[in-house]
Every structure is written in structure tokens, then in C-alpha cells.
Amino acid sequence: MMAADMIESCIKRTLQAFEKWLQKGGKSTDYMVPIGISAMINVVIDAKNQSLKLCAVDGIDVHQYHTKIDEFLEKVSQQMIRGLVQKLISVLENVLGKLARYDEGSVFAPIFNFTSQINISKVLNPASSSQNPPANELGLSYVNFIRANLEIFHQKINDELWILGLFEYWYTQTMNAICDWLTDRLDLSLHPYQMTCLGLIVKKTYSEFEIQGAPEVCLRSKTYQTIYARMQMEEANVHLKMEGGTGGERMFPARGEENDY
């Protein structure tokens, strides 16, 4: 009982510190999860692994009180996942907010249309335009943000199952946020810059989380399929407006034609 009390007290302090850490840092794509956050996650993971040894005899709980510490630790673990993903999603929301400036009817869209004629082939074939500024720098910066933080989690967190749970929730919330953003624009056609950036984000988010082992049932959720169908339509519109609707590789090909999205 004393061991359980000590664990609970320690984890409560750890959670308080964790929540304070999440309040630090901005919402830009330069954000990288601090080592301190990973360390506190590992404290909870280690406590879960050690609680059975400390609060049981011969691997059998001697009192129901001791099983409560396991429930408490699981609750804290899930709370950490939700809090961390909320922080990560705030970066995506910041990116989506910037893309919203290009909405039809906004004061920015005509300016950007005048200053740059975006060619979607620069996104699909970046090597062919390596001497020019990227047409989707905001999308690229977000993809780099995802990759950097995925790597941090793999290097700094000690439990693969915990990491997988984090990744599944992060991916799901990412697709939910993107789908909501698109739903708010059902009556609007996406600006070419919105299309190229968002298309890259959707495509690379899928592939990065697929590499990390996210299950197909999570990756190809109904939300993702809704996004995919919308992006197919928007991409077709961009090709039609800018290339006459002929030729060009597609980021969102018809089902059965895709190789890697």
C-alpha cells in the first residue's frame, strides 16, 4: 500500500510538470517535442512496468487497492497522449489558419494569384524545379515537422506500444482536423496553393505514419477516404485551370492507379 501511495504521488507531480511543459513552445512548424517531455512519459511507462513488482506478491495482487494504481497509471498515460497530441495538432491548426488566407473572397487570394502562377508539377516533380522556390513551402515545413517529431518519439520513448498508441491518435486527430477544415469550405474551390500544400500534407502524413506501423484500418479510415475524394476533385480542378486538364502525374489518382500516396 505504501509503495502504491508513493507511485501515485510521484506520478501526480510528473503529470503537473508535463502539463506545464506542454504550455511552452509556440505553434510553428519549428516546434520539436522537448527531451523533458519524453523523460516524463518514460517515468509513467516505467512506473506501469514496476507497479506489479512493487504492489504485488509473487505476481498476484494482494489487495484491490494495488490494482487501482494500475488503473491510475493507465489513465495518466492516456491523458499524456491526449495532451501531447493536442499540442501537436495546434501546429497543424496554425498551418491551416495560414492556408485559410487564400480562401476565395479573401483579400489575399487575388494578390497571390497575381504574384505567382503555381504549377502543380513542381510539387509532383520537385527535381525539375530545384532552382526555383518551392510552390508548397508551408506544406513542406509541416511534413518536416512531422518527420522530426516522429523520430524524437522513436529515439526518446521506451515503450513501442505506447508510441504506436500515440501515433494512431495523432494520425486520427490530424485527419479529423483536415476534414473539418475542408468541410468548412464545401462551397469553395481550393486555391492552387491550398491544394498543393494540403495535398502534400495529406499524402506524406499517410506515408509517414504507414512507415511507423500504423494499422491500415486507422490509415484508411472513413475520414481519410472523405479527404482523399475531396482532394481528387480539387486536384482535377487545379489541373483543368492551369494545364488545360491534360497530362501530369496526380497526387491523388483514381483507386487502383495509386502507387504510393
Locations of regions flagged by a protein language model:
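Extended alpha-helical "rod" scaffolds
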Residues: 3-261
